[in-house]
């Protein structure tokens, strides 16, 4: 079996879907020596994605999310021979004589189109219906995403397999001495509230700021809030809200961290807060749990499925409830101990090896028969 895997996005985005692609490639290279792989890579990126003789890297000129992608990508692929193409970023090429597996991470753009840029709305909204129609099979990050595909796009349930993701194994408990250099570098004191992720409207950071202001007013000793991640899109309102709420001295923005520094931040935090309006998976929840950090997160999308009984769940529209949950998770020591213990048990359900094995099983089922 010869499998092509579209890894072009890794050059443009190292977080989120880019991390999914990298971990999947690394585990497949370790687990599957019986099949051949073609990694479709951006010609701009010289970084090897897999150190394995059965993995061939083919540089492509066509960039991700380009308006001419459906014209130029099939032309570039026509010179290659493979049985199956895995498109891990929602949209496959329409043309080509090969089986198509797509991964759908979430359907945020259908639930909350106002949370995307006009360009992103055009790319995903205009193509997702055709993508799920031409795909021979679909991998979904969670049961919540599978249910959305069935309900919103009319996909037959048997056409979708749920393959859960996992945190990077580097996320683990660290002692204070190991965290100290990272905290010193960013001038942080341990015990802060932490948000991690892209700064974008879907993450409900403005709601978090409003709830945090209310908590600080009620309890002036509330620790600082650290926003760790990168600026995504439509993020100006976040900075306007910080200024309007007079939180400049309490909120810190820490950008573009390597994963190793995120490990230290999770360990040094008193609490992770992820009040997203929608998540297709929610890796920060598992990353925090793997480090022993209590979690408060939204009850929307996949988060109840991923967090299990190991987090305090909140309605992201109820900012008073969010403030109360943060206060409780900071002050209730028996609850904090329970969340830590349950978090370690919960995160043990997930591994990239399991993700890769289940994905490989889909590859083999798809190529074994022309009938799904």
Q: Over which residues does each language-model region extend?
A:
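Carbohydrate transferase catalytic cores enriched for Leloir-type hexosyltransferases
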Residues: 1-372
